[in-house]
Design a protein with these regions (language model features):
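Electrostatic cytochrome c docking/interface patches
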Residues: 22-44
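Gly/Gly-Pro-rich "capping" loops immediately C-terminal to redox-active cysteine motifs
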Residues: 38-42, 54-87
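The canonical Cys-X-X-Cys-His
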Residues: 41, 45-56, 101, 105
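C-terminal capping alpha-helices of c-type cytochrome domains
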Residues: 91-113
Length: 113
């Protein structure tokens, strides 16, 4: 068999291998909300988020996290949603407080790595 006939297969394997992140690259990726503290985020969430979610979901504030049409699918979307809610409710949280809330929600419900 000619080596030229194997060339497309070799190229395909090389391309697929290059597209897969190495274990080292995955291990070096920063954790989402690395600057957030879930212990500081919980009381902020309890103070401002729970009541609004409960009103929107018939008294069950946690239902927002388990609904089928879940909006948040990535850490960036979670951070954006927390920022959006902060602006809509006018809570006045600073970006570091938003990250604390996102860290709490991630630990409690989302579990992004």
């Amino acid at each position: 068999m000619s080596i030229l006939r194997l060339l497309p297969v070799v190229l395909a394997v090389c391309t697929l291998t290059a597209a897969i992140p190495s274990q080292a690259a995955v291990a070096m990726a920063p954790a989402p909300f690395a600057n957030g503290n879930s212990e500081l985020g919980k009381p902020l969430n309890d103070k401002t988020c729970v009541d609004c979610h409960a009103r929107r979901f018939g008294g069950d504030a946690n239902r927002i996290y388990f609904r089928g049409e879940r909006r948040v699918r990535t850490p960036a979307q979670l951070m954006a949603q927390v920022s959006y809610c902060n602006a809509e409710l006018g809570t006045g949280y600073f970006p570091d407080e938003e990250e604390h809330i996102a860290a709490y929600l991630n630990k409690q419900y989302y579990r992004f790595e």
